[in-house]
């Protein structure tokens, strides 16, 4: 694996796609109290808590993991 894969240092940053995480907050009112439910949907291909980035064919690496700023 190329050293560029660690930082996903692609020449064209538009080739890197950040897999996002969506959050849904539901507030349900009951007779006695308020309950909050948070549902976090994470992409099925994501295997850790960090974001994932895939560099295109024009980059020096493919399938690199990173959190682009």
From Swiss-Prot:
The keyword Nuclease does not apply. GO terms for biological process: cellular detoxification; intracellular copper ion homeostasis. Coiled coil: none annotated. It comes from the Eukaryota. Keywords: Metal-binding, Metal-thiolate cluster. InterPro entries: MT3. The keyword Coiled coil does not apply. Expressed in leaf mesophyll cells, root tips, and at low levels in anthers. GO terms for molecular function: copper ion binding; zinc ion binding. Metallothioneins have a high content of cysteine residues that bind various heavy metals. Functions as a metal chelator of copper (Cu) and zinc (Zn). Plays a role in Cu homeostasis, specifically in the remobilization of Cu from senescing leaves. The mobilization of Cu from internal sources is important for seed development. Belongs to the metallothionein superfamily. Type 15 family. This is Metallothionein-like protein 3.
């Amino acid at each position: 694996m190329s050293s560029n894969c660690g930082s996903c240092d692609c020449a064209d940053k538009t080739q890197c796609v950040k897999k996002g995480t969506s959050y849904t907050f539901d507030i349900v009112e009951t007779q006695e109290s308020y309950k909050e439910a948070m549902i976090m949907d994470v992409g099925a291909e994501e295997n850790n808590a960090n974001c994932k980035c895939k560099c295109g064919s024009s980059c020096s690496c493919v399938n690199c993991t990173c959190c682009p700023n």
